[in-house]
Amino acid sequence: MESTLFLSKPLPTTIKTTTHSLSSVYPNPFKPNNLTFPRTTHKHPTTTTITAAISRTKKEETVETVQKHLENCYLLAAINYKGFTVKQFQDLRKALPENTTLIVAKNTLVEKAVQDTQWAAIKPCMKGMNAWLFVHSEEIPIAIKPYRTFQKERKLEDNDFTGACFEGKFYGPGEVKRLETMPSKAEIFAKLLGSLKSPGSALVGTLQAPARDLVFLLKAYIKKLEDEQQQG
């Protein structure tokens, strides 16, 4: 007996299968194209910014240094140091007396330091390359002489004083020599004593005057001698 199988639908001759990859069904959450991160930009100080800050600090320190040296200062002078070697500058510092200070600073910074002070009279020197000499002594000629000696020995004729400020007054290059020839306090008092000892001196009659008047007169006489020496 033959048996026959009847189907409601004929069997397909070819069975198609569809293969789905795991990644298409379950996307990888760690795959870059499926995960977006916000971009974070970190700003760091640039070299230019750091350099500018350091430069500004140094400028402020220079101004403060100049102002400090101006305390108890009797004379501020500018010297043209163009062409100076490092060794020459070091030797010059050693040659100067202890009551003087020599520094190199930009004209603009020195000008800022002397602003609204009696030293503002030095402003005509604010050009060229200057080294600044601070004299912390009333004996101006004695303080300046070592530089003149150094200048002559090293044949630095071009490195002369470009100006100076003394008692709020500016002295140009040709007038600085007047400061170099001022009499010292010892010389002034010697002249004063000589005048007092002179029988015909008008000061002899003032010895009986009150002490306050005598002191005032002595100061006026000293000032007169200084002015005469400068004019001479």
Swiss-Prot record:
Residues 1-52 form a transit peptide. Pfam families: Ribosomal_L10. The keyword rRNA-binding applies. It is found in: Plastid, Chloroplast. InterPro entries: Ribosomal_uL10 (IPR001790), Ribosomal_uL10-like_sf (IPR043141), Ribosomal_uL10_bac (IPR022973), Ribosomal_uL10_bac_type (IPR047865). It comes from the Eukaryota. One of its GO terms (cellular component) is large ribosomal subunit. The keyword Nucleotidyltransferase does not apply. Keywords: Chloroplast, Plastid, Ribonucleoprotein, Ribosomal protein, RNA-binding, rRNA-binding, Transit peptide. Signal peptide: none annotated. One of its GO terms (molecular function) is rRNA binding. One of its GO terms (biological process) is translation. Its main location: plastid. Three forms, which differ in pI and possibly also in C-terminal length, are produced, L10 alpha, L10 beta and L10 gamma. Belongs to the universal ribosomal protein uL10 family. Component of the chloroplast large ribosomal subunit (LSU). Mature 70S chloroplast ribosomes of higher plants consist of a small (30S) and a large (50S) subunit. The 30S small subunit contains 1 molecule of ribosomal RNA (16S rRNA) and 24 different proteins. The 50S large subunit contains 3 rRNA molecules (23S, 5S and 4.5S rRNA) and 33 different proteins. Component of the chloroplast ribosome (chloro-ribosome), a dedicated translation machinery responsible for the synthesis of chloroplast genome-encoded proteins, including proteins of the transcription and translation machinery and components of the photosynthetic apparatus. This is Large ribosomal subunit protein uL10c. The gene is RPL10.
